[in-house]
Amino acid sequence: MIFGQRGSRDLGTEQPEIAHGTPATKMVVSGLRSQSGWEATNKALTFTPSPLKALTADREESDETSYRGGVTQGANLVPRMLFFVKEEGTTSRLGMSSGRVNYRSMRTPQEKSPWKSLPDLTGVIERRFIYDVHLGSTIAPFRALQPWRAILPINRDRLLEEEHIETADSTLAQWWHDATSRWEQNRNVTTKISLWQQINYQGKLTHQLGAPAHRVVYSASGTSLAAARLNDPRQVIEHKLYWIPARNLQEAQYLSAVLNAPLTTKTVAEYQSRGLFGARDFDTYVWRLPIPIYDSEQELHQRLVALAQRAEDVAGQTDLEGMAFQKARKVVRAALDAGGIHAKLNDAVAELLGLPES
């Protein structure tokens, strides 16, 4: 609703300043609605004034002097049962031809209808078409966990066009025929894109091919940021992760240190959407923070690299055998806390970003 005010015709009369922009503070309302009515609900709510941080598309720094322009979301490899597989041993007396493996769809309890009720995809595939894939569930702070395995129509760092998949290899052609048939028969009626368009939506798969030696990945959502570096350019990144290229090992460790600092999560929470258990989506909000480009001559940057190395050592030596990824992250963070690394990361990141220490 807009209220207008008629201006004075006397141009010589000083006019009050017109209200514009957004207020400096906001009122944060939290609590649960009471079934007893609004009066009881009002008593159950808390009202907390908080500084207002407005989201804006305006940028003070160009993509050449910040990391935000290089951040990319992973590929849409869903529905997962069409792509992710487990390798199986052969039952043939003659064994499997060299370079070929039996596969079966990898299934999880998190699958949704109608895909969870469909039978597995099974068959034989050339091993060169099976790729390691990292998802949100394969990343812990400062440590990449065991990647999943997926069949993808990629050959020599090139995503095969749909018409070329049929002629590239007979085993790949059979898998693609089976996968696309399932997709077309079971996709949502409002979904018009092909399976090929799905996996390369907005170029998120092709953008990864021919990747640099060092990349940093971080969780797209959650209550705490989890980031790790990858050093295998052939590994593929799924859409529950965002990734950013690094020029060298030290820059990758620098970024991992900044992203994994608890203070970073706390600061980014101001921008996040919120769910029942708190802030949830990180997306690219973290890059609204004034994170400077890595400079090896800066002592503070070197300190963050050293802290990342210590954190990687601690995370790598932590026993995570058999743990679900949520618990694995919790155990790694507890080890970093116990070693005093989180506190040192917070101190360094507060200095880097000009923030009050947590």
Model-inferred region functions:
Residues M1-G4, G74, A211, S221, ...:
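Functionally constrained cores in energy, signaling, and assembly domains
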Residues M1-P79:
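Flexible, glycine-/basic-rich loop-and-beta segments that form/coincide
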Residues R6-D10, T180-R187, P262-T267, Y271, ...:
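A generic secondary-structure signal for well-formed alpha-helical elements
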Residues S8-A24, L159, V216-A227, H301-A308, ...:
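Short, surface-exposed, charge-dense and proline/glycine-enriched linear segments
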Residues T13-P16, A57-D63, K86-E87, F282, ...:
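Intrinsic disorder/low-complexity signal
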Residues Q15, S36, P49, T56-R59, ...:
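Generic low-complexity, intrinsically disordered sequence content enriched
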Residues T46-A306:
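Polybasic, glycine- and aromatic-enriched phosphate-binding surface used to engage nucleic acids
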Residues L52, T171, V286, P290-S358:
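Non-catalytic DNA-recognition/assembly elements of restriction-modification systems
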